[in-house]
From Swiss-Prot:
Cysteine protease inhibitor which inhibits members of the peptidase C1 family. Does not inhibit asparaginyl endopeptidase. Required for the uptake and/or processing of yolk proteins during the development of oocytes, probably by regulating the catalytic activity of cysteine proteases cpl-1 and cpz-1. May play a protective role against exogenous cysteine proteases derived from soil bacteria or fungi, or rotting fruits and vegetation. It comes from the Eukaryota. One of its GO terms (cellular component) is extracellular space. GO terms for biological process: positive regulation of vitellogenesis; regulation of oocyte development; regulation of protein processing. Its main location: cytoplasm. The record marks G24 as: Reactive site. It is found in: Cytoplasm; Secreted; Cytoplasmic granule. A motif (Secondary area of contact) lies at residues 70-74. The gene is cpi-2. Belongs to the cystatin family. Expressed in germ cells, developing oocytes and sperm, sheath cells surrounding germ cells and oocytes and in the eggshell (at protein level). Expressed in the pharyngeal gland, pharyngeal muscles and some hypodermal cells in the tail. This is Cystatin cpi-2. The keyword Manganese does not apply. Keywords: Cytoplasm, Disulfide bond, Protease inhibitor, Secreted, Signal, Thiol protease inhibitor. It comes from Caenorhabditis elegans.
Length: 143
């Protein structure tokens, strides 16, 4: 009886340790890493193509607030990105031309939170962006 109890405790311990390292599971990342900021800038076109940005100015990334990755026939990166109204007016340049050097965030401009999912298969030179607005953000809200 004592041997069965010891075996059960060891089995539970092994299962608990391995559950924290689930293969193929989503892994939280440090959202402040430059690679995630770069990915947010690459998603600018998708963010601005959303019908929810119907103002006269393009949105630009302010900050990546959350990041996670998952291995799924490539790598799926999920970002939560705070964006703000920039000083770049629609019609004066194309959304894919927006960069951090030519578009700055407007003081007092509108802000929103978007979820950006990037599916990458580097060996196939494949990259797919999915963008979804989460919600509008008030000017005094801190991240």
């Amino acid at each position: 009886m004592k041997a069965i109890l010891v075996f059960a405790l060891i089995a539970i311990s092994i299962i608990s340790v391995n559950a924290g390292m689930m293969t193929g599971g989503s892994v939280e990342q440090d959202a402040s890493q430059k690679e995630y900021s770069d990915k947010a800038w690459k998603a600018v076109k998708g963010i601005n193509d959303q019908a929810s940005n119907n103002g006269p100015y393009y949105y630009a990334p302010i900050k990546v607030t959350k990041a996670s990755t998952q291995v799924v026939a490539g790598i799926s990166t999920k970002l939560e990105v705070l964006v703000g109204e920039s000083n770049c007016k629609k019609g004066e340049l194309q959304a894919h031309e927006i960069t951090s050097s030519n578009c700055q965030i407007k003081d007092g401009g509108s802000r929103a939170l978007y979820q950006v999912t990037i599916w990458e298969k580097p060996w196939e030179n494949f990259e797919q962006f999915t963008v979804e607005k989460i919600r509008d953000v008030t000017a005094d809200e801190q991240f």
